[in-house]
Amino acid sequence: MTITPATHAISINPATGEQLSVLPWAGADDIENALQLAAAGFRDWRETNIDYRAEKLRDIGKALRARSEEMAQMITREMGKPINQARAEVAKSANLCDWYAEHGPAMLKAEPTLVENQQAVIEYRPLGTILAIMPWNFPLWQVMRGAVPIILAGNGYLLKHAPNVMGCAQLIAQVFKDAGIPQGVYGWLNADNDGVSQMIKDSRIAAVTVTGSVRAGAAIGAQAGAALKKCVLELGGSDPFIVLNDADLELAVKAAVAGRYQNTGQVCAAAKRFIIEEGIASAFTERFVAAAAALKMGDPRDEENALGPMARFDLRDELHHQVEKTLAQGARLLLGGEKMAGAGNYYPPTVLANVTPEMTAFREEMFGPVAAITIAKDAEHALELANDSEFGLSATIFTTDETQARQMAARLECGGVFINGYCASDARVAFGGVKKSGFGRELSHFGLHEFCNIQTVWKDRI
């Protein structure tokens, strides 16, 4: 049988080009079996009490820590994340389990209120089995930050993972099995687009959550809407990183490099458009380029390397095409900008200057290690440039004037604003975007309540 992406999910080591695994797409019988298991699992799981479910989250965290190095190595092998960053992803995911186990039950308590001397209570009920379509860039964290609160709320979770990280998908499933999560409460399926469509239409799927591209999110969201099913979309970003004249330059440069080049730049909420007030632009650019040039890139298994390969060769080629288009439009290349020779999908830290709003690097998401620098005349101009985007995931402001920063934050069209620090997701705060970056929220109590039936129970209402 010929193996192609049309028939199989294919995992390829992005550092070497070695084929790691192939897995056939799920057929109709596989999908039906998964949905039957999910329906049965949900019926039983919804009847368990919240304290039991919280304790099972702790068990998931323990099981994940027991396989921490195995999981980190799998992440690095399948999608090229530098090993230290992969280990951090595993640790963060395990800590998420503990945080929701400790704080989640209180977030799901009934909320009584008095209504005209009568009793009304808001209850947080399970919704059903949630279909999750997840990406490859954080192959563990993206799954866990959805699955953990979804399962705590009494729902089931059915995963369709990205085809290039099937090893990660299998290992995550093993972690949940190790923790004693019943079959059907957590499940995964290697489904293609047709299989996803079939599941969205099925009555045993209650809702859908997607992390991915705008194109994928729009397509899946349309199908969920046609089926009248709730969905949460966490999509792309072209996040602005604003540096004003009074900023702490050293701190701003350090945060800018970390915010842009983490995970080899393959982060939806990474800083991508660097909007620098003209009085500090020259000094910032000089230091930023020097710091980016000092980053070590190479074998992601080597702990000394800060950047690894990009996850797929087609993604690297697309990124390079965007760079070439931006240069042809008049931008200036200060660093990088060339595909690396030899094995692996390597692309060097790249810095583009003189980027203006009509250019590709400003208008499109650059999903890789490319920074685009745009000069702003003043703070008001910086704000206008930041909002001049179809995306609205996060934004950063560097300034020593906190009052001005908070005033700007109120006018930024995005889901999260970070003052004197770069964007990161955290269990304690909501994460999500506006505009074409999607809708709905993950994490904190907002993420926990997204997939609850928020039910009003009103006594003596006549």
Curated annotation (Swiss-Prot):
GO terms for molecular function: aldehyde dehydrogenase [NAD(P)+] activity; protein homodimerization activity; succinate-semialdehyde dehydrogenase (NAD+) activity; succinate-semialdehyde dehydrogenase (NADP+) activity; succinate-semialdehyde dehydrogenase [NAD(P)+] activity. The active site is at E234 (proton acceptor), C268 (nucleophile). The keyword NADP applies. It catalyses: succinate semialdehyde + NAD(+) + H2O = succinate + NADH + 2 H(+); succinate semialdehyde + NADP(+) + H2O = succinate + NADPH + 2 H(+). Pfam families: Aldedh (PF00171). Optimum pH is 8.2. Activity decreases sharply as the pH is raised above pH 9.2. Its EC number is 1.2.1.16. Induction: By p-hydroxyphenylacetate, succinate semialdehyde (SSA) and putrescine. Highly expressed under several stress conditions together with many genes related to the metabolism of nitrogen compounds. Disruption phenotype: Cells are unable to grow on 4-hydroxyphenylacetate. One of its GO terms (biological process) is arginine catabolic process. NADP(+) binds at W136, N137, K160, H161, A162, P163, G212, S213, L235, E365. Pathway: Amino-acid degradation; 4-aminobutanoate degradation. Keywords: NADP, Oxidoreductase. Catalyzes the NAD(+)-dependent oxidation of succinate semialdehyde to succinate. It acts preferentially with NAD as cosubstrate but can also use NADP. Prevents the toxic accumulation of succinate semialdehyde (SSA) and plays an important role when arginine and putrescine are used as the sole nitrogen or carbon sources. PANTHER family: SUCCINATE SEMIALDEHYDE DEHYDROGENASE [NAD(P)+] SAD. Homodimer. NCBIfam families: PRK13968.1 (NF010575). Belongs to the aldehyde dehydrogenase family. This is Succinate semialdehyde dehydrogenase [NAD(P)+] Sad. It comes from Escherichia coli (strain K12). The gene is sad.
